From Swiss-Prot:
Domain of life from the UniProt record: Bacteria
Organism of derivation: Alkalilimnicola ehrlichii (strain ATCC BAA-1101 / DSM 17681 / MLHE-1)
Protein name: Protein Smg homolog
Family: Belongs to the Smg family.
Length: 157
């Protein structure tokens, strides 16, 4: 069965990252468990590389752009991220859930998934993981978590 990096990340997030009740096992234990769960060593390594890239983003300086700056997507990004996904990212930025640095990190992490098709659910999960990893984003994380799991928010265009 072909698994994706994204499925490994979802497994880790649901079972360990978002669970504050239990201490997190070490990386070797996680790799063994993921292998036993049916993920390939290559996918496991790529998922940990993805998480390392997310963790490394905490040390990157934020770039400042003007208030009226418009994000223009590169051709590779428009191929991978459909109009609905890009529109949702814009909505999150306009709603104050993502700032510019958060938006760029979400786009970076979506591109790092190496999946050809990035759908709206994938975008929502990646936004949730990015917000979870960013200090001071608890309220935005809770909002995204409600949106992802409860789906109470109706977007009006």
């Amino acid at each position: 069965m072909k698994q994706s990096i994204f499925e490994v990340l979802i497994y880790l997030f649901e079972n360990y990252l978002a669970n504050d009740d239990e201490p997190s096992p070490d990386r070797d234990s996680l790799e063994s468990e993921l292998f036993e769960a049916g993920f390939t060593p290559l996918e496991i390594r790529k998922a940990f590389d993805w998480l390392d890239g997310l963790a490394d983003s905490r040390n990157m300086p934020a770039t400042v752009t003007g208030d009226r700056a418009i994000r223009v997507y590169h051709e590779r990004e428009t191929v991978r991220l459909d109009v609905e996904s890009r529109g949702f990212i814009l909505f999150l930025e306009q709603a104050g859930i993502l700032d510019r640095a958060g938006r760029e990190l979400v786009i970076d992490r979506l591109m790092a998934l190496e999946d050809d098709d990035v759908d709206l659910d994938t975008v929502k999960w990646v936004v949730l993981m990015v917000l979870f990893n960013q200090p001071g984003q608890e309220e935005a994380f809770n909002w995204m978590e409600d949106l992802l799991f409860d789906n109470p928010v109706h977007l009006v265009h």
